[in-house]
């Protein structure tokens, strides 16, 4: 069983990318569980065709830890993908990252990881790998990490910060970085920029996902692109990304760059003056 965490700047399309990749792997015959590690509890919405499932933390609050049952917090979605949302604390109370810890520990207690799974995906909130949201890495659940980014400055800034956190854990023998996924924003020289940025981080751009209105069309219909129309060119892109992740055997400890180096890189590729 391979355990994979997806990180990235808020709004970059991380959850969309993760769910489409999960759907692609499911269509290839793999068995998956997706654990949404975001208090918004929207990391599995497309796989569940818009159905909002009860989160682990909401269920714990409603019935208490002794009465929680696995079938109450694990819902089957597209292609048989098992979907879980960790949820979060009540507004203004508690720590969202702590909620991730509680949710994953609850899943383990309930035996969710004993199923015959090929992949577990963790869709993790956070521009920075803070203690709670780093839990899938720190506690040895996620073994490989992919960062979703674009050629925009703040997306690369966040990716670099995430790499700083990954580096700390990787040096202690925890997870490794599997690569960057460029979710295109049609930035000038975007592919070349992200490839060079990845090289400097001691990793690779595992796939360039082109911008497509079909992603939005599928989302309006509350589906992944694979589910909406598996023959679309964008569906092929997600299948290709899934194939590359499945075949990837190059995992590294990242080498983050300085902010000055990042700004110089942006200037080198004509992104900023």
Curated annotation (Swiss-Prot):
Its EC number is 1.18.6.1. The keyword Transcription regulation does not apply. Homodimer. Its cofactor is [4Fe-4S] cluster. Binds 1 [4Fe-4S] cluster per dimer. The reversible ADP-ribosylation of Arg-98 inactivates the nitrogenase reductase and regulates nitrogenase activity. One of its GO terms (molecular function) is metal ion binding. The lineage of its organism: Bacteria, Bacillati, Chloroflexota, Chloroflexia, Chloroflexales. This is Nitrogenase iron protein. The key enzymatic reactions in nitrogen fixation are catalyzed by the nitrogenase complex, which has 2 components: the iron protein and the molybdenum-iron protein. [4Fe-4S] cluster binds at residues 95, 130.
